[in-house]
Amino acid sequence: MKFIVIKIGGSTLSDMHPSIINNIKHLRSNNIYPIIVHGGGPFINEALSNQQIEPHFVNGLRVTDKATMTITKHTLIADVNTALVAQFNQQQCSAIGLCGLDAQLFEIKRFDQQYGYVGVPTTLNIDSLSYLCTKFVPIINSIGFNNHDGEFYNINADTLAYFIAASLEAPIYVLSNIAGVLINDVVIPQLPLADINQYIEHGDIYGGMIPKVLDAKNAIKNGCPKVIIASGNKPNIIEAIYNNDFVGTTILKSSV
């Protein structure tokens, strides 16, 4: 089976171009199995704000206490994931919403005590996911379940998406409000792994892009053939990426 993992950023979910679903239907008609992974940071922040809970971050990662976890789980599963599945089904693209608990999709462990209920994926149930792909478009949110302590955990959605891509040895399209990796304010079309550390050391890659490219580097080292970072608000962006005719950045082992 040929898979493509598509990570849809929280900022893109509310402004997702309608052609994305049609492009995904087209992939499936060609026996390519897309897997959607999403987070929902802006929606979580809004839900926390409505409950007068201030979000707290350490080193760019959300600290998730028990109250925050309850709201995060409800927001991602009941609100964001359900709404996304509904969009797909309304366009006659049969989708199924999943978290890590469903079909024992993936196992997790606690990331670090200081971050509270934040987990990292450890094992992907490839058999379950492969079977679901033959029937539906899986739409996976970033909530996992820890079988050892019986608790739900929040997972960084980028980390989860890269983990799934590496486990399946599949390419990943990372769609957000970012057009690609910028060097001197210009989107670079290719970023070989060997150049990443140099760009970071020189300050050309900085801020929130650093964890994105380092996660991409790790995914490629673990089996993902390539990572594409592009804007999810462009028409027919998935088809354009598949046909290698797009504005964005392809991160890969070596330049082509």
UniProtKB/Swiss-Prot annotation:
Superkingdom classification of source: Bacteria
Q: Which GO terms describe its biological process?
A: arginine biosynthetic process via ornithine; L-arginine biosynthetic process
Enzyme Commission number: 2.7.2.8
Provide the catalytic activity annotation: N-acetyl-L-glutamate + ATP = N-acetyl-L-glutamyl 5-phosphate + ADP
Which is one Gene Ontology cellular component term of this protein? cytoplasm
* Molecular function GO terms recorded: acetylglutamate kinase activity; ATP binding
Q: What does this protein do?
A: Catalyzes the ATP-dependent phosphorylation of N-acetyl-L-glutamate.
NCBIfam families on file: argB
Please name the PANTHER family in this protein's record. Answer: N-ACETYLGLUTAMATE SYNTHASE, N-ACETYLGLUTAMATE SYNTHASE, MITOCHONDRIAL
The protein here is known as Acetylglutamate kinase
